[in-house]
């Protein structure tokens, strides 16, 4: 005789399952709330703390690069390369090679005792250049078109819709350069101090360093849409508007000339970069959503600011630098401008006469092209057997006399200025 198994209490089991379900849902809600509060809406660190952390990171990266260069030099000693001696002209004199010490001696510049110089004249030139650039941008959409093409280039991810520029402000102030000094560096850009001696400066180059400070409000505002394409395309669309403003930039600009090599045909270049002690303060505003909008999300601002600093560091912060190829500075006729057929004391009137002569020359060139075109048509007709006695439509006596004047027969040029005789 078997004893039946006891029937479990259904009420107790169902109650425990409900409690577990509620507890799991509550834990998920708590985790989501904590994530939103502390990760998205959490207070960002102060700008001073963030700038100090970034400066420390950049400084450690620069020191690591210098240590790697020193280690490489000590492990693999350099051998002086002896280039092939090319045959030199006997006409050109062979002066002594200009080393760094020779240049400093001939210019009476002592890098150890010379005081830093102000750059007031340079600030004026830079201000005029920037002012002209801003004035051109007000009357031309070239900068707006270029920005739109760059933002919507091939690197735009698939989850972003078309990016539209909604605001562009180029600022009102100008950068101030000051405290310029010249220091000798080696071919890798490392500073040659006094311990390097005169021998260490023979094969190096000179580098100019100047402080830069800009306090302005340069703004670029864009708007786009985040496209959620999973599990199927365009499941959700989230409008996003961003405005990034450069509030202040301060740092040290380093400029040096890298001489070219006549052996391999490399040109002379201008190399510039910023030292790792710079500071870039940004103001980032954001607006997410269409109806219930989230304004100025701190985490979005932190991500964009970190991305912009990384972009700047990877391009023009030491040890990385930018190189610009310099054109030839030898005076050439094709580069000559101004002073054509003008008297010494002429001013606006002379310039106006020069411009009128340019217009007259353009009109003559245009008329010459039309005459050549009609001559080609007449030659083609003669080859086809068409009678040349029949004048063309719109012509009366031939190519030379296109229209008859009222008083006398003279050569009238199409498009010429009234009263201009071309006899």
Swiss-Prot record:
UniProt GO MF annotations: lipid binding; lipid transfer activity
Basic and acidic residues compositional bias, start-end: 355-372
Region (Disordered): 332-372, 387-423
Pfam families per record: MMM1
Keyword hit for Transport: yes
Keyword Nucleotide-binding: no
GO cellular component: endoplasmic reticulum membrane; ERMES complex
Database matches in InterPro entries: Mmm1 (IPR027537), MMM1_dom (IPR019411), SMP_LBD (IPR031468)
CDD domains: SMP_Mmm1
Residue intervals on the Cytoplasmic side: 42-423
Domain notes per entry: The SMP-LTD domain is a barrel-like domain that can bind various types of glycerophospholipids in its interior and mediate their transfer between two adjacent bilayers.
UniProt name for this protein: Maintenance of mitochondrial morphology protein 1
Species assigned in the record: Botryotinia fuckeliana (strain B05.10) (Noble rot fungus)
């Amino acid at each position: 005789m078997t004893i039946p198994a006891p029937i479990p209490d259904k009420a107790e089991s169902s109650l425990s399952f409900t409690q577990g379900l509620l507890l799991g849902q509550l834990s998920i809600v708590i985790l989501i709330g904590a994530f939103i509060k502390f990760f998205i809406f959490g207070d960002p660190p102060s700008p001073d703390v963030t700038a100090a952390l970034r400066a420390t990171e950049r400084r450690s990266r620069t020191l690591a690069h210098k240590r790697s260069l020193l280690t490489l030099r000590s492990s693999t000693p350099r051998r002086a390369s002896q280039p092939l001696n090319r045959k030199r002209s006997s006409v050109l004199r062979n002066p002594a090679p200009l080393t760094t010490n020779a240049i400093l001696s001939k210019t009476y510049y002592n890098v150890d005792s010379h005081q830093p110089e102000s750059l007031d004249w340079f600030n004026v030139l830079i201000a005029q250049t920037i002012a002209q650039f801003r004035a051109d941008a007000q009357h031309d959409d070239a900068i707006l078109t270029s920005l739109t093409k760059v933002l919507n280039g091939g690197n735009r991810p698939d989850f972003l819709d078309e990016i539209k520029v909604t605001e562009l402000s180029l600022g009102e102030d100008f950068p101030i350069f000051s405290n310029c000094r010249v220091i000798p560096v080696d071919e890798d850009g490392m500073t040659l101090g006094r311990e390097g001696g005169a021998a260490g400066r023979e094969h190096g180059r000179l580098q100019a360093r100047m402080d830069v400070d800009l306090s302005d409000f340069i703004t670029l505002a864009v708007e786009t849409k985040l496209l959620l394409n999973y599990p199927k395309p365009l499941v959700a669309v989230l409008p996003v508007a961003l405005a990034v403003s450069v509030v202040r930039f301060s740092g040290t600009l380093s400029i040096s000339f890298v001489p070219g090599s006549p052996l391999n045909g490399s040109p002379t270049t201008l190399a510039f970069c910023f030292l790792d002690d710079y500071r870039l303060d940004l103001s980032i505003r954001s607006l997410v959503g269409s109806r219930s909008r989230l304004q100025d999300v701190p985490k979005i601002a932190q991500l964009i600011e970190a991305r912009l600093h990384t972009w700047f560091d990877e391009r023009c912060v030491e040890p990385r630098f930018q190189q610009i190829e310099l054109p030839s500075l030898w005076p050439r006729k094709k580069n000559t401008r101004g002073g054509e057929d003008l008297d010494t004391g002429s001013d606006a009137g002379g310039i106006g006469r020069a411009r009128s002569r340019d217009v007259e020359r353009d009109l003559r060139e245009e008329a010459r092209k039309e005459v050549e075109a009609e001559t080609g048509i007449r030659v083609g007709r003669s080859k086809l057997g068409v009678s040349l006695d029949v004048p063309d439509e719109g012509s009366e006596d031939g190519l030379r006399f296109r229209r008859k004047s009222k008083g006398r027969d003279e050569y009238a040029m199409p498009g010429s200025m009234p009263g201009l005789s071309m006899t």
